[in-house]
Amino acid sequence: MTQDALFELLSQGHGGVLVTLKRDGRPQLSNVSHHFYRDERMVRISVTDDRAKTRNLRRDPRASYHVSTPDRRAYAVAEGTVELSPVAEDPYDETVEELIRLYRDVVGEHPDWDDYRAAMVRDRRLVVRLKVERTYGIPDGANRG
């Protein structure tokens, strides 16, 4: 099992499970969309300010992120420490620009960027930046047979 193979698995899809820690120490799991920026060893995720996962990360920035192949035979877990961007407050602030980059990397072009910018502010969106410190899992192809 190599880290490169696990990074490849993180890069292949755009959906996974973000694991944060509740106040009582139990895990809280959220299905989310992501993009893995391999050169930065960074998983980025768009979230809203009022969600449990966001509150959990403000209190304890440790997190894990799980992805798997469609057949679930291969998986990767990325563990690390999260940094949260500021909440989007203006359609042209740095947070909205980062959200646009993330959207493009996950989905592609948006049909109306002005509408998107306004929605990011209205929804009080921000970016979760999970700096990958450790990976483990079973790379694609290693569990066939």
Predicted feature residues:
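Charged, gly/pro-rich active-site loop segments
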Residues: 74-145
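Structured helix-beta-strand junction loops
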Residues: 12-13, 60, 123-124
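AMP-binding (ANL) adenylation modules
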Residues: 71
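Short beta-strand segments
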Residues: 14-49, 63-67, 75-78
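Short, basic/aromatic recognition patches
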Residues: 1-17
